[in-house]
């Protein structure tokens, strides 16, 4: 569990045979080999740091994370940090600083570009935030630029790289949180819809869309308080909604052509489900529940 921004989230990542995670008790990052399951090894020292939103920069043998550094009688400082993985005790270095808060550091598939969102007091990320993009090398980042939100009138959510290295994100520039594609020079809507393809960013790693393949986005959106799922054909800008009994959905991810999410409804306890491209819904895991007659529930 991460303590960054107090609400935490995205406290682990997996690369090859290793799990990297933030330990709740001391907020240090540990490495755990998944095959041997031996004792986890701390790779960050004891200190004033907290970490979240971990990603692996394999090309440069390091982690990139949001770091929150606490000092007595001072406001905590947030920045993007690198943590070297080729030492027994990793060094923590600032990668990007200056804003009050950071989230969603994300590497392009070729690991040459890094994007992130940032915001500053007094705004919350759903009030006003910026999407930034920079080139990345062993020595750091170069040519950072704001590609969305520079006017202070946008809220950005979940930047995400497509399999073919195009950058997508969610913006509320039209007063609806819609998905956009950055084509290298400007931001274009993937689909214009009077619906919200995002949620307030209370925790790191929140996700409402992912790529089934280079041409298809699996997504969640909310309309009049009810959540829906579907697939967007990027080429034709067509949305295919999925008919299901669920009205509450969150935490979307895709794997091997399927959409996975946590879903529930007023009369259905939340469970992990998967949906294939033929809109077949499968329950993956449902917790044990008490049988309650729906007539006893307020509708």
Regions found by a protein language model. Name each.
Residues 18-34, 38-41, 51-56, 60-63:
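Hydrophobic or amphipathic alpha-helical targeting/insertion segments
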Residues 6-14, 203-212:
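Signature of short aromatic-glycine-proline-rich micro-motifs recurring in repeat-based ectodomains
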Residues 19, 63, 114, 167-168, ...:
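Hydrophobic beta-strand positions that form the internal "hydrophobic ladder"
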Residues 2-6, 21-30, 45-51, 66-80, ...:
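A flexible loop/linker signature enriched in serine peptidases of the S9 family
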Residues 33-37, 84-88, 136-139, 182-185, ...:
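Short loop/turn segments that connect beta-strands within beta-propeller blades
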Residues 14-16, 57-59, 109-110, 162-164, ...:
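Residue-level detector of Asp-centered blade-edge/turn motifs that repeat once per structural unit
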Residues 39-45, 92-96, 142-148, 187-194, ...:
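Beta-propeller fold detector
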Residues 52, 64-67, 73, 103-104, ...:
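Non-catalytic accessory segments flanking enzyme active sites
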């Amino acid at each position: 569990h991460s303590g960054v921004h107090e609400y935490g989230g995205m406290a682990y990542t997996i690369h090859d045979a290793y799990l990297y995670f933030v330990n709740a008790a001391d907020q240090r990052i540990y490495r755990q080999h998944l095959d041997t399951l031996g004792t986890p090894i701390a790779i960050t020292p004891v200190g004033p740091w907290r970490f979240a939103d971990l990603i692996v920069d394999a090309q440069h043998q390091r982690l990139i994370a949001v770091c929150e550094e606490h000092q007595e009688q001072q406001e905590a400082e947030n920045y993007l940090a690198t943590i070297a993985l080729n030492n027994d005790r990793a060094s923590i270095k600032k990668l990007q600083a200056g804003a009050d808060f950071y989230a969603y550091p994300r590497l392009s598939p070729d690991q040459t570009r890094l994007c992130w969102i940032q915001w500053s007091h007094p705004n919350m990320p759903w009030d006003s935030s910026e999407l930034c993009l920079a080139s990345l090398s062993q020595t750091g980042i170069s040519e950072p630029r704001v590609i969305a939100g520079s006017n202070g009138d946008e809220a950005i959510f979940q930047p995400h790289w497509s399999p073919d290295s195009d950058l997508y994100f969610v913006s509320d520039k039209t007063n609806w949180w819609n998905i956009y594609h950055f084509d290298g020079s400007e931001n274009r809507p993937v689909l214009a819809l009077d619906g919200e393809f995002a949620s307030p960013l209370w925790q790191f790693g929140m996700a409402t869309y992912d790529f089934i393949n280079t041409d298809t986005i699996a997504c969640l959106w909310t309309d009049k308080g009810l959540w829906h799922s579907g697939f967007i054909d990027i080429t034709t800008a067509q949305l295919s909604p999925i008919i299901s009994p669920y009205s509450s959905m969150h935490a979307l991810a895709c794997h091997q052509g399927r959409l996975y999410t946590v879903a529930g409804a007023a009369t259905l306890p939340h469970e992990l489900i998967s949906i294939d491209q033929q809109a077949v819904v499968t329950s993956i895991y449902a917790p044990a529940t008490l049988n309650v007659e729906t007539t006893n529930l307020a509708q």
